[in-house]
Amino acid sequence: MKTPIELKILDSRIGSQFPLPAYATPGSAGMDLRAMIETTMVIQPGETQLIPTGIAVHVADPSLAAVILPRSGMGHKHGIVLGNLVGLIDSDYQGPLMVSCWNRSNEPFTLEIGDRLAQLVFVPVVQAEFKLVDEFDTSDRGEGGFGHSGTQ
């Protein structure tokens, strides 16, 4: 069963020149987001640019959130990653979706109008409530972290 999420088109090219975000296959977890820029853009090495996607979403359900994640080929082949690593879209946010793109390569990267640059994934959210304690119950792991379990 699919959960309905409100989507607002902010750029008229979405739905006419470029498709609405959609799952590419029945097993896809994410929907591609496109660079809805006005002209070709070059992202220089080390530079970060904020790219509009041409859409806004309103998740509305506090048990869900959306995350903007990189497309694997962009980082691996071109050195283009998200400037904030992961973009979190809270259920009550209604503004435009923007993608922060960082060129971590040594070469300029050309972004064309409508290029697919990231993906949108919806995830479940559990809102926790803290319970103050003086000590934790003992666990097998304890305070071990940052390499505590080894590499083998």
Curated annotation (Swiss-Prot):
Name the enzyme group at the top EC level. hydrolase
Give a single Pfam family match: dUTPase
Q: Which UniProt keywords apply?
A: Hydrolase, Magnesium, Metal-binding, Nucleotide metabolism
Q: Look up keyword Transcription and say if it applies.
A: no
Required co-factors: Mg(2+)
- Name the chemical reaction catalysed here: dUTP + H2O = dUMP + diphosphate + H(+)
Q: Where does substrate bind?
A: 71-73, 84, 88-90, 98
The record's CDD domains line, in alphabetical order, gives: trimeric_dUTPase (cd07557)
What pathway annotation does it carry?
A: Pyrimidine metabolism; dUMP biosynthesis; dUMP from dCTP (dUTP route): step 2/2
The protein's GO terms of the molecular function aspect are: dUTP diphosphatase activity; magnesium ion binding
E.C. code: 3.6.1.23
Question: Biological process (GO) annotations?
Answer: dUMP biosynthetic process; dUTP catabolic process
NCBIfam families, alphabetized: dut (TIGR00576), PRK00601.1 (NF001862)
- Similarity-based family: Belongs to the dUTPase family.
Function noted in UniProt:
This enzyme is involved in nucleotide metabolism: it produces dUMP, the immediate precursor of thymidine nucleotides and it decreases the intracellular concentration of dUTP so that uracil cannot be incorporated into DNA.
Q: What is this protein called?
A: Deoxyuridine 5'-triphosphate nucleotidohydrolase
Species name for this entry?
Shewanella loihica (strain ATCC BAA-1088 / PV-4)
What gene does the UniProt entry assign to this protein? dut
